[in-house]
Amino acid sequence: MQYAHPVAFQRNLNDNWREFTERVLQPLFDYLTERVGAESSVLYVLERYVRRVEWFDRQALYDQAMANSQRAEEVYDTDLRRFLFSEGMNMPFSQAKSASGLSDVVSELDTDDPLVCELKIFDGASRGKRHLGSGVNQAVQYASDYGKHTAYLVIINLSGRQLALPNDGDPKVWPPNIDVASVRVYLIAVRALPTKSASKQGKPAPVNITQANLVDPDTIDGAGE
């Protein structure tokens, strides 16, 4: 009887661990795997969008945008939505209402995993760092509305200068990202100025954009910032 007791105890302990693993650990592992997989899938699609614009559609989109510069952002936003839809992302609404207002791209609202993606133009003039900061703020607000911890900011760079973006992640891994209020915001820069226009500017110094610029507009000074 004294021998049987530790054997029974060991069996019960193993059963308890097995139950704990099945009920607690396995769902956690499944969730983390699904989340990482979903982020990787979205980033893959957005990387394809960057290449498509830079390699094939840069001039055409720019011409459309400049035909009515006040609606330039709408041109690129519509193009992004169309591309995401063609890549299999369910997007029933182009701008869906949330508690914070309207998000540029909120897809799969009928599922438990909506995609929150903002798009902003950066031209170094009227649409500068403060404009990008508003995009980060909107992305974080919409992510919070939908209970998400991941958001994406697509930056249409029309400045002709490289953007040195802040990064809380691995500097060797694309794209850079920042963590704001428990939301990870991926920063997707697209070189959208036609190459002929960019070449006339030579090789200007990169635009240094800090995390403070994106989350605290009071740190930004000077015209065109």
Language model features: what each stretch is:
Residues 156-225:
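Domain-level recognition of nuclease-like catalytic cores that cleave nucleotide substrates
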Residues 1-9, 116, 123:
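Short acidic, glycine/tyrosine-flanked loop/strand segments centered on an H-E-D-like triad
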Residues 3-70:
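Interdomain/boundary linker segments immediately adjacent to catalytic/signaling cores
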Residues 80, 105-107, 115-124, 142:
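Conserved catalytic cores of phosphodiester-cleaving nucleases, focusing on short active-site segments
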Residues 115-117, 152-154, 186-188:
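Hydrophobic/aromatic beta-strand patches that form the interior of the parallel beta-sheet core
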Residues 52-94:
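Acidic-basic catalytic patches of nuclease active cores, encompassing PD-(D/E)XK
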Residues 86-113:
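Active-site metal-binding core of divalent-cation-utilizing nuclease and nuclease-like domains
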Residues 121-162:
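Catalytic cores of nucleic-acid endonucleases
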